[in-house]
Amino acid sequence: MMENVFDYEDIQLIPAKCIVNSRSECDTTVTLGKHKFKLPVVPANMQTIIDERIATYLAENNYFYIMHRFQPEKRISFIRDMQSRGLIASISVGVKEDEYEFVQQLAAEHLTPEYITIDIAHGHSNAVINMIQHIKKHLPESFVIAGNVGTPEAVRELENAGADATKVGIGPGKVCITKIKTGFGTGGWQLAALRWCAKAASKPIIADGGIRTHGDVAKSIRFGATMVMIGSLFAGHEESPGETIEKDGKLYKEYFGSASEFQKGEKKNVEGKKMFVEHKGSLEDTLIEMEQDLQSSISYAGGTKLDSIRTVDYVVVKNSIFNGDKVY
């Protein structure tokens, strides 16, 4: 049994002496594989979070992105389209038989996406290990992200199989109900799980799920994440895919989980739900605010770069830091 687990709202980072005159001097960039990105943040590869338009916007502006895999037949034209514009192609694959053929087809057509994310709910499995090896054999130049996992053993095994990064988080997401439906996962202790996994990792880790505030991005970095995947905070923007509805004079957008009946079109093995989030304005504004908040985090950490956050002290506050006033 794990002792002393904690989640984002149980932790406060402790400030160190500031060395900048303005937070604008702080550098939030991060390198993943061969490319450098403006923020250590990636919108979730979910149908109500990202589409081709948003992927293009993110890539053009030096943000990392991962396209979802829910219209698999569009992936080849997507890769061609992105690369023809001089942008990175970053796609998702599953582990079913036709995905093996898809990888071979990419190799045959000499299409190498810069990033491939093997994306299944329970990533600590032979199915994922086999797919990592298959991709590495046919597309050795692609950077492979494998997940999702929640234990150090899983991180080690996927790294040993050839994964270039692992994605950590089982069910902590806002529209994920894995914890309720199965009793398993990292919901409620995602930050501790991240720390536990990061200690075992020799390659980058992507924290996935449970982020509710911008401060949680800094906390993820403190506990070992290179990149932080975010769903709900990116949902509900003008550009976001999904229906807009009006209720009591307020605008909302739908946001649903990746194994929800809304996404699957059926009610079998449902582990996701749908919710309506308040309409948030433009994605660009949110990304700019995230960058500014992270610059402030870096200045509180007493540094000029993201890495300075990794060494700050922290406290575990057993009463939630939000004193009952939920900020999200």
UniProtKB/Swiss-Prot annotation:
One of its GO terms (biological process) is purine nucleotide metabolic process. The active site is at C176. Gene3D superfamilies: Aldolase class I. It comes from the Bacteria. It is an enzyme of class 1 (oxidoreductase). NADP(+) binds at residues 205-228. The keyword Endoplasmic reticulum does not apply. One of its GO terms (cellular component) is GMP reductase complex. It holds the Pfam family IMPDH. Its EC number is 1.7.1.7. Keywords: NADP, Oxidoreductase. It catalyses: IMP + NH4(+) + NADP(+) = GMP + NADPH + 2 H(+). InterPro entries: Aldolase_TIM, Dihydroorotate_DH_CS, GMP_reductase, GuaC_type_2, IMP_DH/GMP_Rdtase_CS, IMP_DH_GMPRt. GO terms for molecular function: GMP reductase activity; oxidoreductase activity, acting on the CH-CH group of donors. NCBIfam families: GMP_reduct_2 (TIGR01306), PRK05458.1 (NF003966). Belongs to the IMPDH/GMPR family. GuaC type 2 subfamily. Catalyzes the irreversible NADPH-dependent deamination of GMP to IMP. It functions in the conversion of nucleobase, nucleoside and nucleotide derivatives of G to A nucleotides, and in maintaining the intracellular balance of A and G nucleotides. This is GMP reductase. The gene is guaC.
